[in-house]
Amino acid sequence: MNSFISMIRNGYSDTIPVWFMRQAGRYLKEYNEKKGRMTIKEICMDPELIAGISYDPVRILNVDAAIIFSDITIPLEALGYKIEFLPGGPRIINGYIKNHDMKDIIYFEESNFKYKIYDAIKIFKEKYHFPLIGFSGGLITVLSYIIAGGPDSNLNLTKRSMLSDDKFNDYINIIKDMIIKYIRLQVRAGVDAIQIFDSWLGYLSPQTYENYIKGHIEEILSEINVPVIYFSTGTSSIIEKLSRLNVDYISVDWRLDMKLARSMVNKKGLQGNLDPLIAAYNLRYALKETSDIINAAGRSSYIFNLGHGVIPETPVENLKHIVNFVHNFNQ
């Protein structure tokens, strides 16, 4: 059995599984050649291309799982939001600031979702017969994009809306519904697991997380019937609370010591957490930290990953060496 599948289902495998967030990205010349001048949205209209881009890291790096190529903002277009991808990240043209009353914004329906993610997943599974992770943005992270119109520094605009705007619950409900339906679509297409990317969750206080967001996250998770990995950053103060969610693995960033994380997540699995910059700029030290991380996390219920996505400057050879090191750890 593939080590990723064995680990995420059973908590054990003969070798430690490894994959990387943003493993299909700009650091790969194969990705850049396939992408050319195409936009993310144009790529997401071509299911064969999505499947091929998603599989490239498996072939090149020898990772143990692929993740479907897409973007967390892509399903927002089915709600009526207009998205542009700019160098600094996606921008929502008709978000909260310009469209506070949510004019022409509707609930997610698959018939309104034009991107070929479902077809790409089907093609990937039929063509490559390899573990595939689907994904969605986390609730507060996706909300922050539509409220701020793009990345929301420190969640300032999002928290202001959360605390003072009567319409915030309308935004919560429509995004929660979208996340549930978009995950169902991917599960139905055949993904083996789901990762939720809640990169901005750490900007909430523990009390705000409990009082405003946790219940909605629990609703989302109750609708998922494949293994779930929950990724967030800056959440060391609530990691124990996150471990009580109905998830299988907690993916942590590089700022949390893995031994401490293991003591805080009860019996949940762990994923992470090498600093992406270390992986990019100092292979020798990256391998030392990788060893320290694995020793701290332990071999059971553990998936090796970075603490965030691969950065574009990362040498492919560095990641190959890291994968090989993890696979041969204590063999």
Curated annotation (Swiss-Prot):
Pathway in which this enzyme or protein is active: Porphyrin-containing compound metabolism; protoporphyrin-IX biosynthesis; coproporphyrinogen-III from 5-aminolevulinate: step 4/4
GO molecular function per UniProt: uroporphyrinogen decarboxylase activity
Keywords: Cytoplasm, Decarboxylase, Lyase, Porphyrin biosynthesis
Binding positions for substrate per the UniProt entry: 22-26, 71, 145, 199, 308
Main EC class the enzyme belongs to: lyase
CDD domains: URO-D (cd00717)
Sites marked Transition state stabilizer: 71
Classification via Pfam families: URO-D
GO biological process: protoporphyrinogen IX biosynthetic process
Subcellular location: Cytoplasm
Catalytic activity: uroporphyrinogen III + 4 H(+) = coproporphyrinogen III + 4 CO2
EC number(s) from the headed UniProt entry: 4.1.1.37
InterPro entries xref list: UROD/MetE-like_sf, Uroporphyrinogen_deCO2ase_HemE, Uroporphyrinogen_deCOase
SUPFAM superfamilies in UniProt: UROD/MetE-like (SSF51726)
GO cellular component: cytosol
Record-linked PROSITE patterns: UROD_1
Main subcellular location of this protein, as a coarse class: cytoplasm
Subunit structure: Homodimer.
Family: Belongs to the uroporphyrinogen decarboxylase family.
Protein role: Catalyzes the decarboxylation of four acetate groups of uroporphyrinogen-III to yield coproporphyrinogen-III.
Name used for this protein in its record: Uroporphyrinogen decarboxylase
Organism, scientific name: Picrophilus torridus (strain ATCC 700027 / DSM 9790 / JCM 10055 / NBRC 100828 / KAW 2/3)
Encoding gene, per UniProt annotation: hemE
